[in-house]
Amino acid sequence: MNTSRLFSLLFQGSLVKRIAAGLVLGIVVALISAPLQETIGFNLAEKVGVLGTIFVKALRAVAPILIFFLVMAALANRKIGTKSNMKEIIVLYLLGTFLAAFVAVIAGFAFPTEVVLAAKEDSSSAPQAVGQVLLTLILNVVDNPLNAIFKANFIGVLAWSIGLGLALRHASDATKNVLSDFAEGVSKIVHVIISFAPFGVFGLVAETLSDKGLVALGGYVQLLAVLIGTMLFTAFVVNPILVYWKIRRNPYPLVWTCVRESGVTAFFTRSSAANIPVNIELAKRLNLDEETYSVSIPLGANINMAGAAITITILTLAAVHTLGLEVSFVSALLLSIVAALCACGASGVAGGSLLLIPLACSLFGISDDVAAQMIGVGFIIGILQDSTETALNSSTDVLFTAAVCMEEERKNAA
């Protein structure tokens, strides 16, 4: 096999297939490491585990600067003044994202899930009262921006990026272009890091299973079931309720159409941005207002992130349960609000929702090391989790757009 063929095999093609291959190879290495240890003189799984360590370290390094530039550029470049019914669509987007996070909080408490993590004892204690959580949140918000980036204070990074983004909305086009270029540059770096995800998953799975045994897979299966179950509940219960609120008739024909023609495609592309043409074509077939959907669907690909909010919430609560921390429901409700707000920063970035887990974990005093391990867990289950998340996000874009347009038609016909 020549060098170019090997490079193509390792770094090109479907990322889902390569991660699946890394997952399978990691399990195989974990199973054969113990029998081979006496023969080769070392534990093979522990040696390849360094690949997972490097991968998680790279993710932790790029996450603060990624959030800073992406959010700032998105807000600075957002056009001021839109069609009046855009407000209703944006309200649906934000309300749907929050309700998804709220449902995830309920699911996280109803089906507490633990996963196997290393160095559980390194985590700090969670605040006992919501007042302490809020105080910590405020102190993190007013942190020095450079210190926030340097120490990975994600709440401080998010606060400063939002503030600067809003302040720069009236800046010159040249300034906005520079911000967009920086955001694009950081996104490309993230893309390179994500391309190594199969190696990272390989190392993480091999080391975890070798150390903890196959019982570790049980936690992942339950975690995946809770995640996907919450997303399905949101898609087929929560979203139809919101649609009925708008159109005042049976919402399920519209819901099924959007899931079938938009969600299925998004499931395989795993990209809300790549699914925008599919959604626009579906909007045309539904005879929706072109001036509305031409703006709302691309906007939804950036701010309508119910799936990301669910992922952030469920994985954060999994870390809480794994560490045995006592967290009040009110504090968890605050988590749903934070998850809904920061989920917008996950758009257009491979694994973006996973990169925001440390931000949510910091609300409960969970150490950055444990949060980074939860990112690794997210990539292990990401073969199904990320696809389902994208399907929910993208299909909801056209669903809520159609609901508002149909409401306008109903009002005009009355």
UniProtKB/Swiss-Prot annotation:
The chain crosses the membrane at residues 22-42, 54-74, 89-109, 148-168, 189-209, 223-243, 305-325, 337-357. Belongs to the dicarboxylate/amino acid:cation symporter (DAACS) (TC 2.A.23) family. One of its GO terms (biological process) is serine transport. InterPro entries: Na-dicarboxylate_symporter, Na:dicarbo_symporter_sf, Ser_Thr_transp_SstT. GO terms for molecular function: neutral L-amino acid:sodium symporter activity. It is found in: Cell inner membrane. It catalyses: L-serine(in) + Na(+)(in) = L-serine(out) + Na(+)(out); L-threonine(in) + Na(+)(in) = L-threonine(out) + Na(+)(out). Its main location: membrane. This is Serine/threonine transporter SstT. NCBIfam families: PRK13628.1. The keyword Membrane applies. Involved in the import of serine and threonine into the cell, with the concomitant import of sodium (symport system).
